[in-house]
UniProtKB/Swiss-Prot annotation:
Record lineage: Eukaryota, Metazoa, Chordata, Craniata, Vertebrata
Keyword vocabulary terms for this entry: Acetylation, Disulfide bond, Glutathionylation, Lyase, Metal-binding, Phosphoprotein, Zinc
Catalytic reaction(s) noted: (R)-S-lactoylglutathione = methylglyoxal + glutathione
Pathway connected to this protein: Secondary metabolite metabolism; methylglyoxal degradation; (R)-lactate from methylglyoxal: step 1/2
N6-acetyllysine: residues bearing it: K148
Function noted in UniProt: Catalyzes the conversion of hemimercaptal, formed from methylglyoxal and glutathione, to S-lactoylglutathione. Involved in the regulation of TNF-induced transcriptional activity of NF-kappa-B. Required for normal osteoclastogenesis.
Oligomeric and partner information: Homodimer.
Family assignment from sequence similarity: Belongs to the glyoxalase I family.
InterPro entries: Glyas_Bleomycin-R_OHBP_Dase, Glyas_Fos-R_dOase_dom, Glyoxalase_1, Glyoxalase_1_CS, VOC
Listed name of the protein: Lactoylglutathione lyase
Record PANTHER family: LACTOYLGLUTATHIONE LYASE, LACTOYLGLUTATHIONE LYASE GLYOXALASE I
Gene: GLO1
Signal peptide location: none
Residue ranges of domain VOC in the record: 31-177
Annotated positions of the N-acetylalanine modification: A2
Length: 184
């Protein structure tokens, strides 16, 4: 008997599960710690991710010999950030799901510099996702702040979620985890 195909022509649930292995016990303490985006202008990006999305800068690292800086952001209380430099670095790199912004010095002044967001050919990286309590309220605030939208919550076939863009054009999905079951 042929395996039933999902409407998309992709893998069935069973086929997807058959491709997966049980986690090796040695990976028990692994965690997805960060995703990195290259940014042209750290001033614009830091403003966007802190003021618009409410993230906290939890660590900054400069590499003068290689002329770049790293900015780690997360949804953390700034009062919890250790003061000691080494402790702060270890703490920042042990947080779950941080966003690392990488700035190569000088790109902010280069008119021709831009980064590919992965949503046009050649496609690759797609987006990051931010969970919010109320998508419509969050998007109303984003509109008031002049944030660029790719998709508003009531647009398209997938109602109730939105996509906005950061200063470099990276897409950010805005979703409510409790409402996603109706879309999937």
């Amino acid at each position: 008997m042929a395996e039933p195909q999902p409407p998309s022509g992709g893998l069935t649930d069973e086929a997807a599960l058959s491709c997966c292995s049980d986690a090796d016990p040695s990976t028990k303490d692994f965690l997805l710690q960060q995703t990195m985006l290259r940014v042209k202008d750290p001033k614009k990006s830091l403003d966007f991710y802190t003021r618009v999305l409410g993230m906290t800068l939890i660590q900054k690292c400069d590499f003068p010999a290689m002329k770049f800086s790293l900015y780690f952001l997360a949804y953390e209380d700034k009062n919890d950030i250790p003061k000691d430099k080494e402790e702060k670095i270890a703490w920042a790199l042990s947080r779950k799901a941080t966003l690392e912004l990488t700035h190569n010095w000088g790109t902010e002044d280069d008119e021709t510099q831009s980064y590919h967001n992965g949503n046009s050919d050649p496609r690759g990286f797609g987006h990051i996702g931010i969970a919010v309590p109320d998508v419509h309220s969050a998007c109303k605030r984003f509109e008031e702040l002049g944030v660029k939208f790719v998709k508003k919550p009531d647009d398209g076939k997938m109602k109730g979620l939105a996509f906005i863009q950061d200063p470099d054009g990276y897409w950010i999905e805005i979703l409510n985890p409790n409402k996603m079951a109706t879309l999937m």
